[in-house]
């Protein structure tokens, strides 16, 4: 897959009128991408990795993540909500994934597709790559686009350590469109895929086409923009549709540690929070983690459950509570690992053949050295 030729697009934006020049963002930025000029913050685009740390620490809400509006749904004949695993964590007293997915259909979507399904396919492929000794160790997960760009900006010598697999988001978007074409008979262009996103970095990955010339995702909608509307509908649904097909470890990708557990690597570590990630990358660069097989690195505190595109309450993110909701889903789901999931097995039977096959390489693998990360 070849990289795109257009300039790198950033989702993190600054409202200069709201900025008070307090320097909170400058102090916390992990790549020194912020300066204070004439009493206002300025974002240096060539350094910004869209991790959302500045959004998290700004007391004046001057930093925002640019996403799309639900009004975009009207541009398509058939609309699919591509649901990130972290979305389930928003509803602390609801561990029924089917209920949440059914409610999305009442917001104007015609179908739903769980990114956790794609995550489990990537987990299975990762396990085979690790077992076959085909990865430079320690292998670093490619799931977090903020971490991938961080490596490109600050640790370019580690790019070859990034696992050369597509993101679950892009893989799931492709599968969702394929299934919709078969179901509706519509042309692919008339089907809209909308990612319900927990963070700024994934919006950037879509708009910049990090992995490919053009993302399979047509629009990115922040979780906080649909949360209240959807929460109001949950209590009015008596019979949820059986829509969830993901195993619980696919859903647990939203927690720090879930992806690493799914990899089944014997020597693995999980790190979350961008400053902690930097420390681990420095350790890898200094060859202090040579005995580790696999590193799951997530920019947001607590993992995607702590992403900056999610609802806030009283100024504090509820990453821990969201994570506990995801753990509860894990405990209640009898299907955990990829090899136990019928939808993952069907995907391999129908499209990928078997792990590490020629067909799997063609559809699941990528060359991370050619990604558009700068």
Question: Model-found features: residue ranges?
Answer:
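Iron-sulfur cluster-binding cysteine motifs and their immediate structural context
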Residues: 2-16, 20-44, 49, 53-68, ...
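Iron-sulfur-associated redox domains of electron-transfer enzymes in respiratory
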Residues: 64-374
